[in-house]
Every structure is written in C-alpha cells, then in structure tokens.
C-alpha cells in the first residue's frame, strides 16, 4: 500500500479532539486512508458508509448506534462516517454525536470534493472540525517518499527560527528580552 503524506498530518494529536474532515476527488484514496487509520488503531468495526441502508436504519433506531460497536481498545477509539453528507441534516447529526461523545471518540468524516460544503457549515459545527484535502497520488508518494514533518507548536517553531545562527542579530536580541 502506498503511504500517503496526509496521514501523519491529519491524524496528529496536535489537532486535539476535533473531527477530521477528509475531502477530495473521487478515487483519491479517502476511504483507503480512513480504513488504514482504523486498522492501525484496532477500530475496523467503526467504519460506517452512509450509502448503506442498514447504517441509516441503525442511526434512526439509536442516534449513537456506533457506541454499541466500541472495540475494547484503544481507550479513545476512532470512528469513520463515510459519505454522511448524503443524509438530510447531516451537520445537525454530526453536531449531536460529537457533543454527546466527542470526549470518548475521535471522528473522521470522509466525502467527495463536493463535500466542501463544510465551509458553509456555519455555527452548527463551528470549532468542532478541521478539514484536510486529499489529492490524487503525488510523485513523492509513488516513489515512497511520503513522510512529512508535522509542523511544531507555533511558539516553539518561532523560537527555534529566531534563535537560529542565520537569524539577524536584531531578532535574536528581541528574544532575549
């Protein structure tokens, strides 16, 4: 399997408990990326494709249906809702789920490029998610050079950059106080 650059970035702990929205064109590998994360975290049963009637029926019967499938590990499992944007009131549905159990689960939401309507999510999902766009394979990924460095904490980054030997003396003086 080809390692994707976005994997390490999107699933970094630095994003906290917020939902991860993975968008992109058809066949870019969104579902594969999600399933890879679930497998890595021992959460394979926590994948739900909202095109399936049984998933929708379970949701109608119990809004938090996925909690019945919770694996014994990890302590905070990942759950993936693929194509949830195809149901009516999907934003309200996600908000209710996240607000109810967002401290006990990590959510990843996948959908096609049309899913970028999340930019208009407004108040219902404000502050509850980060969006990541998965592009088709990049040459470096095909060549096996997908590793990227997750950006450090902004404060640490600035301190490191400003105290670097090639940094102008004036900026170094600012750091000293």
Features from the language model and the residues they span:
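Conserved lysine of the Walker
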Residues: 30-31
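Pre-Walker A adenine-sensing motif
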Residues: 1-14
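Hydrophobic anchor at the beta1->P-loop junction of P-loop NTPases
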Residues: 22
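Conserved P-loop NTPase "ATPase switch" module shared by AAA+ and STAND
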Residues: 72-90
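Short glycine-rich substrate-engagement loop in P-loop NTPases that contacts/grips substrate
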Residues: 45-78
């Amino acid at each position: 399997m080809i390692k994707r650059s976005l994997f390490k970035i999107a699933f970094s702990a630095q994003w906290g408990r917020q939902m991860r929205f993975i968008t992109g064109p058809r066949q870019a590998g969104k579902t594969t990326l999600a399933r890879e994360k679930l497998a890595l975290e021992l959460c394979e049963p926590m994948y739900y494709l909202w095109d399936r009637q049984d998933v929708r029926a379970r949701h109608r019967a119990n809004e938090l249906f996925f909690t019945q499938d919770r694996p014994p590990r990890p302590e905070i499992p990942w759950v993936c809702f693929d194509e949830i944007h195809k149901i009516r009131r999907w934003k309200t549905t996600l908000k209710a789920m996240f607000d109810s159990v967002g401290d006990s689960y990590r959510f990843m939401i996948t959908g096609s490029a049309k899913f970028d309507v999340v930019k208009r999510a407004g108040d219902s999902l404000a502050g509850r998610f980060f969006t990541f766009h998965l592009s088709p394979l990049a040459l470096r990924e095909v060549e096996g050079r997908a590793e990227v460095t997750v950006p450090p904490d902004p404060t640490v980054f600035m301190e490191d950059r400003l105290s670097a030997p090639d940094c102008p003396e004036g900026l170094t003086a600012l750091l000293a106080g």
